[in-house]
């Protein structure tokens, strides 16, 4: 077995005596977070993050150490409603914004720092019906109340959505509400009228509601085969007009923990994964084709999971300019786990937004490099010092009043930086002569690449759908009297890429039409398929397959063709720039669009992450985090400045989460399934499930087996819908009213499918053998699943088997849970209630009962074991297992007013181990 975790004396020395300390007031509110930073052997720098709260306990402002110590305004200032929701937010990074909610908790109006406003209208069932931007209608939604077509199952479903990209129609659903047909029409160039072409995608499911086949908009079909455990077993592709299936993934095997162990790609390439037994971290990855190794990767980590290095045994050591150049990459971190040094190999030239020219496949003209990184006290990357073929320093200038940052040029000072951003914190230009244009929703709309003497410009333009995802991209360039336009239309599993040319004074003609299929593989494997209907390059075969092998953060390292020959390879700097790449032909490599972190690289050099854009040569985002403070008070920082260990899948970032079942029973298993169903419904990866020991793990797998048998029954959908809906709501009308918030009706009807997925994808670990608790990091969350009662110091199952908070705390301690700023979320009923207040009015003050809330009891037991940085989160009221269908981002929902009451997000109460128990205080329950 692989041994991947190594002692790292350098990191240990830098982290010595650098705790994170949270200070609470007498209301148990965190008013200070103190961190200690050290890069070398110097004295630790104390950094204090400050938070203040109103007399009702709601946030007023938050400041990081840099702005607070320099006397600047707080990073964030809030004005909250009486129920505690932030109605006005003033951010130094993102500007001032306001938002209003209706009585159901849905947003009805918002305004950003530029004065752009949105209004949201709802129908009588409280489903989103229209959106207007700055007073102009931008979205319309139509539901199937009257448009009844036999066999189409359209009643109550979303039928048509007119959005900023055009129109999406969904004319047919399965009986259980699964989408069968989706049609997209794009807006024309005038931005007002629809194109006549309708692109239709079709979905096919098995009896369990699992997607088995997708037919894309041009008729290509891809299918997947599952094993008896519901895990992916194979994938195939059938080109439109063909009867033959091409294997993309021939076979795949898993270990007992559900991790990929062995896979065979469609081109015969074999990948073998080996994991460290104690941590389940990937230790080695060997990839071979018949007769030749392609990759022999070994990974090393420090004890907390930071990547220390990666070596590739297939790369021979060579010497250039008296320096060894090999396949080894190393990393070092400071006391806050920010990357401070990295080594690797590169080709000649300074990193810019442009790609270097590709080398021949067998070229050995590479040099070793070392990069060191400097950060300021607010977590901003302030300098990159590069030692290599061409030494240089890339300096950044950070605003004195915010975290906005520009690359140093022409004597730029901190006072000048804010002029490079608009009031909402959106970058105004990539460089001189390259302005950026933003739409009213804060989405990048235009990038000007070059301005010509005749007044024309080379530009890239973008359009987005109603969910904020990119639907079209158009690159327009002008050379030698000819305008060339390259347009990409994004469809489910398919990109349509068309190129037209227009000579001055002439008419446009299409010179290339490419269908690019994005096909999922497994593990580190992904596949692209290229089909030309016009303009096929002479040196590239049509209907070609490209197999891409990725690194731990998803970056494409090695690209192979259908015969397993190398098409290209690429190496990256830690923050995403291309350090070196090689290709067997310039023509082939021009069709490589997905690179760093598995994201598409645009002509500007920016990477499109879905919710925002990333500039790899700057190591930061070009606009503030739409998720707010999910990754801290710095809204521009990339993955906590730890880009080799952490990955941001969509432009947001947060800690890891785990589900922990202290007791195993059918009811608690259902809770775990519901938790992961919620995550799948909002396109998040399911959490791993932690159990005490192997016996509990075997018991859970036995229960899961019984559940899967029941899930194969034809009545499963109706049973689940009945349990989720009619047991929770009293009438059809109330169900539709409560579940009809925008896309919530789709969440409800598609839940059975995701329940099956949550069951089949459930990965379990026992804390005795995996040592997973010892690997928890700052900001990680441990969700405790069980039943509970107000004022009771224990958790239990439906048969009244119970575990005391003392035993629960000791078990976490016994299995080496670290004393870090992580959160334990008690998901039982009434975990913040010292008495049963489930029928209380929306806002009630509770004062000093003798009993302690369950979360408070667990906090006290952890304190007895010398935990001081862990936080325990409790929730008011009796939890609703499927309440997330009403509020998909809520950790805990409850009913106020009994069985006929209102379903609302529970207010959480945080009990910090830094503060001893108190018998008084005030708790406010929020609707």
Show which residues each predicted segment covers.
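Caspase-like cysteine protease fold
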Residues: 870-927
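Short turn/helix-capping motifs enriched in Asx and small/polar residues
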Residues: 564-581, 590, 605-606, 611-612, ...
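Carboxylate/His-rich catalytic cores and anion/metal-binding grooves
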Residues: 24, 32, 46-64, 170-173, ...
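Thioester-forming pentapeptide GCGEQ
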Residues: 1-49, 54-55, 175-178, 184, ...
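Catalytic cores of nucleophile-dependent amide-cleaving enzymes
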Residues: 772, 778-884
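Glycine-rich short-loop/terminal segments
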Residues: 654-810, 915, 922-927
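A motif-centric feature for acidic-aromatic and gly/ser/thr-rich catalytic loops and repeats
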Residues: 537-610
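Acidic/glycine-rich beta-solenoid
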Residues: 40, 68-76, 86, 93-94, ...
């Amino acid at each position: 077995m692989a041994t991947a975790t190594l002692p790292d004396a350098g990191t240990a020395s830098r982290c010595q005596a650098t705790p994170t300390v949270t200070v609470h007031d007498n209301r148990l509110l965190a008013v200070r977070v103190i961190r200690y930073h050290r890069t070398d052997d110097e004295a630790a720098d104390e950094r204090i993050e400050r938070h203040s709260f109103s007399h009702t306990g709601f946030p007023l402002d938050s400041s990081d150490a840099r702005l607070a110590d320099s006397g600047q305004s707080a990073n964030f200032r809030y004005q909250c409603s009486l129920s505690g929701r932030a109605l006005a937010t003033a951010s130094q990074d993102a500007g001032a914004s306001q938002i209003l909610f209706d009585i159901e908790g849905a947003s009805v109006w918002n305004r950003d720092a530029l004065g752009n406003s949105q209004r949201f209208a709802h129908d009588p069932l409280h489903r989103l019906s229209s959106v207007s931007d700055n007073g102009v209608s931008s979205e319309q939604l139509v539901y199937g109340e009257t448009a009844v077509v036999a066999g189409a199952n359209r009643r109550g479903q979303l039928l048509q959505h007119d959005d900023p990209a055009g129109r999406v129609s969904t004319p047919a659903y399965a009986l259980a509400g699964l989408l069968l047909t989706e049609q997209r029409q794009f807006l024309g160039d005038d931005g007002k009228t629809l194109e006549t072409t309708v692109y239709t995608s079709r979905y096919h499911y098995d009896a369990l509601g699992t997607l088995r086949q997708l037919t894309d908009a041009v008729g290509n079909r891809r299918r997947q085969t599952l094993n008896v455990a519901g895990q992916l077993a194979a994938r195939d592709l059938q080109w439109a007009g063909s009867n033959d299936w091409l294997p993309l993934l021939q076979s795949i095997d898993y270990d007992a923990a559900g991790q990929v162990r062995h896979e065979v790609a469609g081109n015969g390439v074999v990948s073998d994964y080996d994991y460290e037994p104690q941590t389940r971290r990937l230790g080695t990855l060997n990839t071979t084709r018949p007769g030749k190794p392609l990759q022999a990767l070994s990974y090393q980590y420090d004890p907390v999971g930071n990547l220390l290095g990666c070596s590739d045994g297939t790369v021979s050591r060579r010497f250039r300019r008296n320096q060894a150049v090999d396949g080894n990459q190393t990393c070092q971190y400071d006391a806050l786990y920010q990357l401070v040094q990295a080594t690797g190999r590169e080709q000649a030239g300074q990193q810019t937004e442009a790609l270097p020219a590709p080398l021949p496949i067998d070229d050995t003209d590479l040099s070793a490099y070392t990069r060191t990184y400097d950060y300021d006290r607010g977590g901003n990357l302030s300098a990159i010092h590069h030692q290599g073929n061409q030494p240089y320093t890339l300096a950044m200038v950070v605003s004195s009043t915010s975290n906005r940052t520009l690359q140093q040029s022409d004597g730029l000072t901190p006072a000048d930086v804010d002029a490079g951003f608009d009031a909402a914190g959106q970058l105004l230009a990539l460089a001189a002569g390259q302005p950026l244009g933003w739409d009213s929703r804060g989405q990048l709309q235009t990038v000007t690449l070059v301005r010509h003497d005749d007044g024309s410009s080379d530009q890239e333009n973008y359009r987005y759908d109603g969910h904020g995802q990119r639907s079209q991209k158009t690159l327009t360039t002008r050379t030698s009297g000819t305008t060339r336009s390259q347009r990409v239309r994004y469809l489910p599993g398919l990109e349509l890429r068309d190129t037209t040319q227009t000579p001055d004074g002439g008419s446009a003609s299409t010179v290339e039409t490419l269908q690019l299929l994005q096909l999922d593989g497994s593990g580190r494997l992904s596949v692209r398929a290229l089909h030309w209907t016009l303009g096929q390059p002479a040196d590239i075969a049509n209907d070609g397959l490209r197999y891409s092998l990725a690194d731990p953060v998803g970056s494409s390292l090695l690209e192979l063709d259908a015969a397993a020959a190398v098409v290209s390879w690429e190496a990256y700097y830690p923050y995403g720039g291309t350090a070196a790449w090689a290709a067997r032909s310039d023509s082939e490599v021009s069709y490589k669009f997905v690179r760093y972190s598995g994201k598409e690289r645009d002509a500007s050099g920016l990477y499109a992450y879905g919710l925002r854009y990333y500039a790899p040569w700057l190591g930061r985002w070009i606009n503030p985090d739409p998720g707010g403070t999910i990754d801290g008070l710095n809204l521009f920082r990339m993955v906590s400045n730890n880009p080799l260990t952490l990955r941001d899948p969509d432009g947001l970032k947060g800690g890891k989460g785990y589900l922990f079942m202290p007791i195993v029973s059918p009811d608690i298993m259902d809770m775990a399934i519901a938790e992961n169903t919620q995550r799948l419904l909002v396109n998040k990866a399911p959490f791993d499930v932690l159990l005490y020991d192997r016996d509990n793990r075997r018991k859970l797998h036995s229960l899961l087996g019984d559940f899967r048998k029941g899930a194969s029954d034809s009545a499963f959908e109706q049973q689940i819908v009945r349990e989720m809906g009619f047991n929770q709501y009293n009438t059809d009308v109330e169900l539709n009213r409560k579940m009809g918030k925008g896309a919530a009706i789709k969440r409800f009807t598609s839940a059975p499918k995701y329940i099956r997925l949550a069951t089949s994808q459930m990965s379990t670990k026992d804390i005795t053998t995996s040592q997973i608790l010892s690997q928890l990091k700052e900001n990680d969350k441990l969700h405790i699943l069980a039943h509970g009662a107000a004022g009771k110091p224990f958790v239990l199952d439906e048969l009244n088997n119970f575990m005391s908070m003392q035993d629960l705390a000791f078990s976490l301690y016994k299995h080496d849970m670290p004393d870090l700023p992580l959160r334990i979320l008690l998901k039982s009923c009434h975990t913040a209630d010292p008495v049963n207040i489930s029928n209380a009015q929306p806002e009630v003050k509770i004062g000093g009962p003798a009993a302690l809330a369950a979360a408070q009891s667990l906090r006290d037991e952890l304190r007895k074991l010398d935990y001081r940085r862990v936080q325990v989160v409790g929730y008011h009221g009796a939890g609703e297992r499927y309440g997330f269908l009403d509020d998909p981002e809520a950790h805990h929902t409850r009913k106020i007013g009994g069985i006929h009451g209102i379903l609302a997000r529970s207010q959480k109460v945080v009990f910090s181990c830094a503060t001893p128990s108190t018998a008084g205080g005030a708790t406010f329950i929020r609707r």
